[in-house]
Amino acid sequence: MPHMDPAIARRTLVAGLPVALISSCLAGCRSQRQSAVRESSSSSHGNLSAPAAMRLPQGWTWVAGSDIPVAKATLRLPVTTTDGTGRRVTIKNANRIIVGGEDVADILAALGWRKLIYAAPTNSVAEAAVNAPKHYGFSKKTGMEGLLSIDGTLFIGNNPMRHGRAAAKFREAGVDAAVVNDRQPIGGKIRAVATFLGDPKAGDKLAGAVERQLVEAAAITRARQGHRLRILAVTASGAGGANAVMGMGTASAEMIAACGATSVGVRAGLRGYSVKFTDEGLLSMKPDVILTGDGDLKRWGGLEGYLKAFPTLAQTPAGRKNHVFVMPSEQIKVSGVGVGAGAIALARALDALSR
């Protein structure tokens, strides 16, 4: 793990933008940038065109990937395999799957197993997880009682550190359980989920499609000369609803890496949705582009809330040039099958900045 930049150490956020600057920015909220990158999706993952109810601040860019791949998988159980914790597990019944993370739900849906998804985390943004029949909270405060009380037949976690113990508890209760290793690329995650349910060939097909998209994204930006663009991805979905910087192990980090750019969060040694940053630290990292999700912008209540959440970003190179990209939250925050399509859209938008 990279050494954490001391300037990114955690502290309380403080306000501090000139009123004139905020007023000017808010006035620009009335129109959208005409040159924004707009790609709508006709896939089963829904319409990814810019939300009609959301008007982006002037100069900001809507970036959305299209052509999200799917594959038709066949359920073949029982299966005995090694999961992400290194344990040999047997899966016999997948009629009601409890997913430990929405990325697992997204992958299941892309493999044609949407109807098997029974319960998902309450804070999900992925469509397949949001539409699950049941939702649950799982944290240090809630413990595992609520999770274990769900009448599922299979638990699939997405993080050995977070879900290894939960999976063991499920097995003790007679419920099948397996965990995906979250530290592997998206292709490995897809193959793991498909293998758990008995169709590794379908997993290879879907993973291959996403991996080819990531290669395509890299090719778009490979010809770009000069320094690697620095991208800062921010969210309103940190622990306890805190504002956070996206670091290692996130969908945004994988997309940024595929584009040949530098993730500010990863470079600072941050992992997941991290609150371990300072306003001054973000300013010193001099991001060329700021990236966030449409759900985050909505949660902040628009531009004014965003400026209060990250008061120094307007003073960064990205802020001064209005190089702020907004993506569908389902693409920027879910390490699922949309990562490749999102990376292509992001690469095209970055390429446009370099011309």
For the regions a protein language model found, what residue spans apply to each?
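His/Asp/Glu-enriched short active-site or ligand-binding loop at hydrolase and phosphoryl-transfer sites
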Residues: 246-274
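Proline-aspartate-enriched helix->loop->beta-strand connector
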Residues: 143-160, 175, 279-292
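Short, solvent-exposed loop/turn elements at domain surfaces
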Residues: 88-91, 105-110, 125-129, 239-244, ...
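A short, structured surface patch at a secondary-structure boundary
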Residues: 60-62, 70-74, 78, 96-150, ...
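Extracytoplasmic ligand-binding site segments that recognize negatively charged/polar headgroups
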Residues: 163-165, 178-192, 196, 226-254, ...
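Bacterial Sec-exported substrate-binding components of ABC uptake systems
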Residues: 2-103, 201-233, 352-355
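Extracytoplasmic/secreted envelope proteins and their assembly/folding machinery
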Residues: 91-95, 101, 105-106, 144, ...
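Structured C-terminal subdomain patch of bacterial secreted/periplasmic proteins
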Residues: 96, 189-190, 195-198, 204, ...
